[in-house]
């Protein structure tokens, strides 16, 4: 079975709204083992929408629409689909009562235009909307299936989970199972080189690499009827990959680097403090976003100015004058200062030039030093990142968290 997603809305074409519906639906279809070869976005135009439907029916079995089910004149998805399949729209009294009740609960009189939403194509299965007034629809006609869903994600997602998912499961004999390995401290090309024989000979499971800022994801995928067999295949391939590159793998699936760090700190009963200059609190923010961080995160220092570095962390004025705020020496003193002015076992520091200005020939934009200190040792590491200010800050935070991760493992 082949599915196609058709997202309706001129606002999508204008870039005014981020289309998260396509991503969500694509993931759900993949989990079901339903092939998705095409995604289409079309504006609120009857002629162009019918054209998209005509193209989709020639190449796909299931058409999943999102958007265009509202009460206004530019909400035309239901009308376009009904007209294309030659179906008459009829008033559904049950839906009308639901819409009226929706407004009554809010003590608001129902606008007459909302009555439009109670008309459905004859013979369609109605999908109830618990969070809005637009019902969803499933239409089976001429060997094709059209599934119409509301555009707002908080309406669409519960409807899909509760009603569409069980409907589609009966068509899905095989499901797609996957495992994502998350790498850090190694580039995409180096991973591919190390796994070249596995990648070239892949049939089942398959592998695909995806580069992200300062990390790489490797997705292992298989399509099986049996979950037990799928897991066995994925685990076997993961073991072979870990044998070669295990030191660079920090997590799996949806794990975040900061979650792994907090988990390791908790496991070893350690506390950490962080001193940040160029990242301006980003590392502290990432760590404290993780539940349980309060047990292992002691404090953070945002020391943007030289005065703050001297006053709060005890960085010697002479060091700042001789080596500058962006230097390995300053990074080490910052880490030591954060350690001595806290109740932590480990202290992390970052200082750098995020840009776009402030760089020089000897110290260009993207130059970053990361320091880490324990009671027995202090180290610093140099990095040279590229990109805009936000990208450099993000990459710096990931590099710092990875250094912290490795230090905790060796502690």
Swiss-Prot record:
Q: Which domain of life is it from?
A: Bacteria
Here the disulfide bonds are none
Q: Which family does it belong to?
A: Belongs to the CinA family.
Q: What PANTHER family does the entry give?
A: NICOTINAMIDE-NUCLEOTIDE AMIDOHYDROLASE PNCC, NMN AMIDOHYDROLASE-LIKE PROTEIN YFAY
NCBIfam families registered for this protein in UniProt: cinA_nterm (TIGR00200), molyb_syn (TIGR00177), PncC_domain (TIGR00199), PRK00549.1 (NF001813)
Please state what the protein is called. Putative competence-damage inducible protein
Name the species this protein comes from.
Caldicellulosiruptor bescii (strain ATCC BAA-1888 / DSM 6725 / KCTC 15123 / Z-1320) (Anaerocellum thermophilum)
